[in-house]
Structures are given as structure tokens and as C-alpha cells.
Amino acid sequence: MTTLADLRINYSRASLDEADVAHDPFAQFDRWFKEALAAKLPEPNTMTLATVGDDGRPSARIVLIKGVDERGFVFFTNYESRKGRDLAAHPQAALLFYWIELERQVRIEGRIEKTSAEESDRYFASRPLGSRIGAWASEQSAVIDSRATLEAQEQAVSERYGDNPPRPPHWGGYRLVPDSIEFWQGRPSRLHDRLLYTRDADTSPSWSISRLSP
């Protein structure tokens, strides 16, 4: 019988060299993300978001990236959820993209800020109607009696707002403003390639690149 200790893959699809990467980590991320799209990976926009609560307890969950530019990485959620409470207490977070089919991961760390109300409104209006209703119906992370309770809340919201629910005040966007971004490429014998971009100053547009030991 196969045991957990016996499960392993020898990575050999590609390499990652300083001479081949973009000087800007956002350009490098864009390059890798486009390659993930071209490879038709299932939901390459999924990422793990790690936060820390007021009690020091870490928490992680999968969320969807909804925007990337030179300012940072944007996602949307309920501000009153566990992640929202964590980020209110400690506005620092880490993101992880894992594209196993390409034997790649990207680790991103930095400070968190809320997006503007206009940016949140614009994205909320683009969501499917069911998702907009769900943002009102779900008290995310709260204990509920049953599935029937959730469905009753959904019906009540639908009857109240019809086809045009506004954005809830407790729902909107966050932007992770990175100070470090690591690109990881799997290599044979666990001697992986790891290139770390670090911002030269808090608001600097320039970055330094270092190679990390695997």
C-alpha cells in the first residue's frame, strides 16, 4: 500500500534563470499567468490568502484574484467575514498561486488596503445577479441554523431588491500592496529554482532580485 511518505513527483518541466525573467515582478507575474491561461489550467485565478487574527491564530482560504496592476493584487469579499476581521486587526497578508501542471508557484507578501468605493461598486455591478444577491444573503463566517435559513435569506433579498441589488456596505475590495514576490519553478531532485523580488523602498517602483536556496 502506498503511504504518504512515498508520494512524490520529480519536477522537470522548466527552469527559471535570472537572465530570462522580467526586471519588474508584475511583468513576470503577467507572463506566468498568461502561460497558465494558455495551458488551460482549471481556474488559474485561484489563490490562497493567508491572514492572522487578533489572537495571533493564522487562517488560510482560497479566493479569486480579480485584478493585478503596478499597485498590487485585488480581491473582493465580505468585510465582516473572518478574513475581513483579520485584515482589520492586522492589515498584512500573504498570497499563494499554485499551478501544479506547470510545476510553479508564486508567493506574495505585503500590506493590505481597501479599494476605493468606486472600484468596489464597479466590480460588484459586473457580478452575476445571483452573486450580488448572495452578498446580501450570506452573513459570511457566521453560524446559521440550516441551509434552509440561508435560502430563506436569499429569497428575502431577491424580493426586496429584484434585479438590481446595490453593493452592501459590508462588501468590497482589498488590494495587497506587495513588498516581496517569489517565483518558484520545480526542478529535478528538489533543487528548485526560487527567485525573490523585493521592493527597494516602501513606495519604490524598483525591485531587487535574489536567488534563494531551495
From Swiss-Prot:
Keywords carried by this UniProt record: Flavoprotein, FMN, Oxidoreductase, Pyridoxine biosynthesis
Cofactor note: Binds 1 FMN per subunit.
InterPro entries tied to this protein: Pyridox_Oxase, Pyridox_Oxase_CS, Pyridox_Oxase_N, Pyridoxamine_oxidase_dimer_C, Split_barrel_FMN-bd
Protein's GO biological process: pyridoxine biosynthetic process
Pathway: Cofactor metabolism; pyridoxal 5'-phosphate salvage; pyridoxal 5'-phosphate from pyridoxamine 5'-phosphate: step 1/1; Cofactor metabolism; pyridoxal 5'-phosphate salvage; pyridoxal 5'-phosphate from pyridoxine 5'-phosphate: step 1/1
Reaction equation(s) it catalyzes: pyridoxamine 5'-phosphate + O2 + H2O = pyridoxal 5'-phosphate + H2O2 + NH4(+); pyridoxine 5'-phosphate + O2 = pyridoxal 5'-phosphate + H2O2
Required cofactor names: FMN
UniProt EC number: 1.4.3.5
Residues spanning the signal sequence: none
Binding site for substrate: 8-11, 66, 123, 127, 131, 190-192
Enzyme class, broadest EC rank: oxidoreductase
SUPFAM superfamilies in the record: FMN-binding split barrel
Residues annotated to bind FMN: 61-66, 76-77, 82-83, 105, 140-141, 184, 194
Recorded superkingdom: Bacteria
GO molecular function, a single term: pyridoxamine phosphate oxidase activity
Function summary: Catalyzes the oxidation of either pyridoxine 5'-phosphate (PNP) or pyridoxamine 5'-phosphate (PMP) into pyridoxal 5'-phosphate (PLP).
Annotated family: Belongs to the pyridoxamine 5'-phosphate oxidase family.
Subunit structure: Homodimer.
Record HAMAP family: PdxH
Name listed for the protein in its UniProt record: Pyridoxine/pyridoxamine 5'-phosphate oxidase
